[in-house]
Amino acid sequence: MQVKRIIHINVSFTLMLSWDETLFKNPEVFDPDYIPDELLFRDGQIRQLVSCIKPAMLNSSPINAFCLGPPSTGKTSTIRYVLREAERETGLLYSYIRIPRFKEPYKVFSKIFQDVLGQQSPPSGISKTVLMDRVWSNLDEPLLVVLDDINFLGKNYANEILYEILKAPDEYGVKVGIVAAATDVKFPLLLDPFVGASFHYMEIHYPSYGYAEIEGILRKRVEHGFYEGVFDDGAFRRVVELAYRASDVRYGIYLLKAAGMNAESRGSRKVEERDVEVAHAGESLSFIAKILTALNSEERAVLRMIYSQNAISTGDLYEQVCSEIKMSYRKYYNILEKLERLKLIEISFGEKGRGKTRYVQGKYDAEVVDRAMQLI
C-alpha cells in the first residue's frame, strides 16, 4: 500500500510544472503590438498598401490611402507590417500616430516634428504654424504620415490636421502622403468639402474575419507561442468559438495568453478548457471596458437602455431614448450603427404587425457590461 501511494505521488508530480518551467515558448506573440512575419488572409490589403507606399521608396510622393473596416480586421497590423518591411528595405521615413493617444492637433504635429527632426518638439508656447513650418522646411525626403484610428478625432480636429498635411506639397514643395485608418466607413464623408476636395486616396477595405480565418490566425499564435502539445484541442476550439462570437481576433489572442497563465498558476503542463473559461470570465470584463472607451456619454446611455431589457424594436427603443435624451432619429440611427460596428449589439429583423421590424439586443452578459461601464 505504501509503495502504491509513493508511485501515485510521483506520477502526479510529473504532471506539475516546477517553479522554473513554463508553457510559453515565445510569450511575446500574444502582446498587443506583436506583428508576425506572416499576416494571414490580408494579402490583397498588403499589396494595396505597398502600391501606395512604393513611390516614397523611389523618392517620389506616397499615394494617400484610407483603410476602412470594423474593429479587429487587421488594419493596424497590415499598416505596421508594411511599414516595418519598407523601413528594412529602404529606410522609409514615416510618422506613425495612434490617434487615441494623440487626440489634439498640437500633439499630432509634435509627434510628426519628433519623427522627422529626431528631437523633442519645442515647448507648447510655440504655435502649431511655427511648429509645422520647421517640419516642412527641414523635410528633404518623402514622408508618410499614418493616422491610425482617425475616427477618434473630432471632425474639426481631423479637418485641421489633414489640411495642414495636404497643403504642404504646394506651399513647401515637399513630398508627403497620408495613410489613415478608421472603423467608421462613413468617416471620410464627414470631412469638410474643402479638405475632401484635395484629399484623394485609395480606399482599402477590411471585411470581418470568418470562423475558419479566426481559427487559422489563432492556430498560428498557439504554434509560435506555446510549446508543442501544450494547448488542449478542446480548449483551443473554445477560444476560437468565443473569439468568433465576439467577432474579434484580439479577444482570442487575449484568451490564449490568459488561459496559458491560468494553467501555469495551477502548475499544469496542459492548457485545458477550464483555463479558458476562467480567462473568459476575467478577460471579458476588461475587454469590454476597453471597447466602451470609444463611446461618448450619449452612446453609453443608449447602450445602457439596450442592455436593461430583452430584444426591443428600434422604434420602441427610440421612444425610450427620447424620453430621457433629446436626440434626432438620424443621430440615434448613427449611434446604433456604431454600437453594432463595435460588436456591442446585434440588430436583426423580426415580424411585428405588417412587414418586418428591426430588433436590437446586447451581445454580452448585461451584468458584465454594467460592471465594465463602472470601470471607465
Swiss-Prot record:
Gene3D superfamilies documented for this protein: 1.10.8.60, P-loop containing nucleotide triphosphate hydrolases (3.40.50.300), Winged helix-like DNA-binding domain superfamily/Winged helix DNA-binding domain (1.10.10.10)
Instruction: Please verify whether the record's keywords include DNA damage.
Output: no
Entry-linked InterPro entries: AAA_22, Cdc6_C, Cdc6_lid, ORC1/CDC6, Orc1/Cdc6_arc, P-loop_NTPase, WH-like_DNA-bd_sf, WH_DNA-bd_sf
Highest taxon in the source lineage: Archaea
**Pfam families cross-referenced by the UniProt entry:** AAA_22, Cdc6_lid
- The record lists ATP as bound by 73-77, 209, 221
Q: A Gene Ontology molecular-function term?
A: ATP binding
Q: Which GO terms describe its biological process?
A: DNA replication
Q: What UniProt keywords apply to this chain's record, in alphabetical order?
A: ATP-binding, DNA replication, Nucleotide-binding
* Keyword ATP-binding on entry: yes
Note the HAMAP family from the entry.
ORC1_type_DNA_replic_protein
Q: What does this protein do?
A: Involved in regulation of DNA replication.
- Name the family the entry cites: Belongs to the CDC6/cdc18 family.
Matching NCBIfam families? orc1/cdc6 family replication initiation protein (TIGR02928), PRK00411.1-2 (NF001624)
Name under which the protein is recorded: ORC1-type DNA replication protein 2
Species, as recorded: Archaeoglobus fulgidus (strain ATCC 49558 / DSM 4304 / JCM 9628 / NBRC 100126 / VC-16)
